């Protein structure tokens, strides 16, 4: 009888582990990090989180919402984690905790203007209106540059206003700016705001220190793996060599 009970407990334990779910929030409007393709969520963050979840035994359940709603949803326990190309800024760290960074290559941020604009570099934009996504790190860059940030729910809205000359410029992560420059007419890049290794991390509730540690340890485990390298090459091919160089340094 004891043997049967032990076997049943093992089966139930295995089933429980196999079906544990993690509800993860993202904003699928930030190519190549996360975006919709044929009504399916794809991107670097999406595949990376699925890989991390697999390593830890989680089934990832995705929740798509506006960028500025992500951290409030996390705090209200509507989701368990956030991955959305989000930087772990000091201001955000007051409200939530973060994993270690999961991006291991240097980046930057494009300064984009209307193609009829006479602006030639970011310094020309002091006192000018610059479109940024609500809650994004680009808002800080705009302020640091002496510009007046105008907040948008997403970069598509900001760039449409730029096309129509309703704002003077948009600041956007270069990997995403590159995608918009390919497909949108009437805009051009004039400058880049350089960034060191971005502090791009996964957000968790303050109380979920164990969960944050689990994911941090797993990021360290997979960063040297062929799977991670393939994701970098797939979504950030222009940064692949830089990624390899940084791995050798570490």
Name each region found by the language model:
Residues 28, 104-113, 178-220, 238-250:
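Periplasmic-binding protein-like
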Residues 19-86, 94:
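Extracytoplasmic small-molecule ligand-binding "clamshell" domains
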């Amino acid at each position: 009888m004891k043997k049967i009970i032990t076997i049943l407990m093992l089966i139930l334990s295995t089933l429980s582990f196999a079906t544990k779910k993690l509800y993860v929030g993202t904003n699928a409007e930030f190519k190549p990090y996360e975006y919709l393709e044929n009504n399916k969520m794809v991107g670097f963050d999406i595949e990376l989180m699925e890989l991390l979840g697999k390593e830890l035994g989680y089934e990832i359940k995705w929740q798509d919402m506006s960028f500025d709603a992500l951290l409030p949803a996390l705090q209200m326990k509507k989701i368990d984690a956030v991955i959305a190309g989000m930087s772990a800024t000091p201001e955000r760290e007051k409200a939530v905790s973060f994993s270690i960074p999961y991006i291991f290559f240097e980046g930057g941020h494009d300064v984009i203007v209307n193609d009829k604009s006479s602006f030639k570099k970011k310094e020309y934009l002091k006192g000018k209106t610059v479109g940024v996504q609500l809650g994004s790190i680009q808002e800080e860059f705009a302020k640091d540059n002496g510009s007046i940030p105008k907040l948008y729910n997403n970069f598509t809205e900001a760039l449409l206003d730029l096309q129509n000359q309703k704002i003077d410029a948009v600041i956007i992560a270069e990997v995403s700016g590159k995608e918009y420059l390919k497909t949108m007419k009437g805009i051009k890049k004039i400058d880049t705001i350089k960034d060191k290794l971005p502090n791009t991390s996964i957000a968790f509730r303050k109380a979920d220190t164990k969960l944050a540690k689990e994911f941090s340890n797993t990021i360290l485990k997979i960063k040297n793996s062929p799977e991670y390298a393939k994701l970098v090459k797939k979504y950030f091919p222009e940064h692949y060599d830089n990624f390899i160089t940084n791995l050798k340094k570490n």
